[in-house]
From Swiss-Prot:
This is Beta-glucuronidase. One of its GO terms (molecular function) is beta-glucuronidase activity. The active site is at 451 (proton donor). The gene is GUSB. Its EC number is 3.2.1.31. It comes from Sus scrofa (Pig). Residues 1-22 form the signal peptide. Homotetramer.
Amino acid sequence: MVRGPAGAWAVLGPLLWGCGLALLQGGMLYPQESRSRERKELNGLWSFRADFSDNRRQGFEQQWYRKPLRESGPTLDMPVPSSFNDISQDGRLRSFIGWVWYEREAILPQRWTQDLGTRVVLRISSAHYYAIVWVNGVHVTEHEGGHLPFEADISKLVQTGPLSSCRITIAINNTLSPHTLPPGTILYKTDTSKYPKGYFVQNTNFDFFNYAGLHRPVLLYTTPTAYIDDITVTTDVDQDTGLVNYQIFVQGSDHFQLEVHLLDEEGRVVAKGTGGQGQLQVPSAHLWWPYLMHERPAYLYSLEVKLTAQTSAGPLSDFYTLPVGIRTVAVTERQFLINGKPFYFHGVNKHEDADIRGKGFDWSLLVKDFNLLRWLGANAFRTSHYPYAEEVMQLCDRYGIVVIDESPGVGIVLAQSFSNASLQHHLEVMEEMVRRDKNHPAVVMWSVANEPSSFLEQAAYYFKMLIGHTKALDPSRPVTFVTSSSYEKDLGVPYVDVICVNSYYSWYHDYGHMEVIQLQLATQFERWHEAYQKPIIQSEYGAETIIGFHEDPPLMFSEEYQKGLLQQYHVILDQKRKEYVVGELIWNFADFMTDQSPQRAIGNRKGIFTRQRQPKSAAFLLRERYWKLANETRYLQSAVMSQCVGNSPFTV
């Protein structure tokens, strides 16, 4: 832990790190309504208060969770989901580090509070970074990590007494330490001639703003007390027969029956089974294909599971439906294969980032982004640099957008961040991530980290253990991390299945000299492949551009420079994709916010779209390229032409 001048950890810490996380058990199925399940979203306005006290502990010392938050002092209306940073006009809140408090009163349906055969669950989809939760003043759960969901069974708290409401209080701390994901450090400024006593700043080693708050939906949902806890599905193909292997876990009863039906998109039952595990065979199966690779992409079956259980209160039934895409993924020395066919990633890196809402989930923004992805002809993106919202993954399944699913392992550059404590937490994060996203056909590869100091001696053991653990959790998908180290010094790449390389030739060095890009990029690819004989993805490349800046001949930050740099990369990518390069992902889809610095003009401007999703010149260049690539690499001839005539906009 980072320690202050008195030898104790930064005053933000004592309540933050009081307990370690045990290895995860149980499922994390997405809450859905069914014949046996209900859900109540708690999105909207919450009461909010930041703890501006010197030690950031006033809320705990005064036990703000024991009574309505408004009684503790002034509160703000805070929208959920949203980051809190850009909502208010108080500049202190934008860069606030420490504990903030959220509260919401929820009115519950009478059946939820009186039917003892009903289980009531509170689910928080994302709270950045560390969260403690109380219901009616009673502690119910804690969670470390800002990008994955967590839950608490609150049935006993809401099913006692005449109350038909519950008061939910959530305290969130956004402090990052060398052992968090992502990591960071607290730096105390001790020169009292320049800084007030106790002044500190949060330092990070990643290039995006450390937005915080309740970023994704908060909701209540119900199940019977005997319920379907988890479902795991893997798929395979035997000639034209699709194979769906399933495993179902039940909680709340040892005496139960399970019925499983697989339905096609027309609602017809194509296979059925019984029991907690088995294999369904689907003759003449429709496979799940990526967008633009097939005339019928993203085909989804529905796996309907019915549980009938005997309990002390009598028989109970539970129903859950899981979308299933039948597809295979494989990697050779030179190819990435989906359903046995070579797949070429032509896509983007993204961020969950937008004006005002920060990293807050927004359906309007999400649908707009997917419309832009399809307009662009992109077939893939990486969830740089953390797991995205579950709803994002669901749309990827529906639209056929392939996903490299990345953990929050960004900024792992200090030796302390390779410690056993860091590794243990990273292993747990991968468990949470795989548990949540394992059933999404769009997810074709796990990425455990981005640009770590993989040249450090500790990195070899760290990535051997981390990648091995991820493969043990999910043997069906390849695993990678994204490197910016040199091929001869990287100690983690020997353990990956696909080499993902970030490089910024003629941007972060050789400024303005685009004439060296082709030589340097070709050399990069040749040395990596000669050393490891693995397929390679150019996982990041790009240039910063401020829309409306024009210079000819091209100068840095102009739209012409961004276009010219991309064109130089594309020359070599076109050569090497015929050999062993299997993808290219531009950095970035859209401009995004960063910490303030002389190097950043209100954020990172490497997007091909502005933060408001307006296209720069490079967007049209990339669109022309991606549609050309789609036509060259499609599996069936009618795949692209049926949706894009003359490379014109289309409606799906």
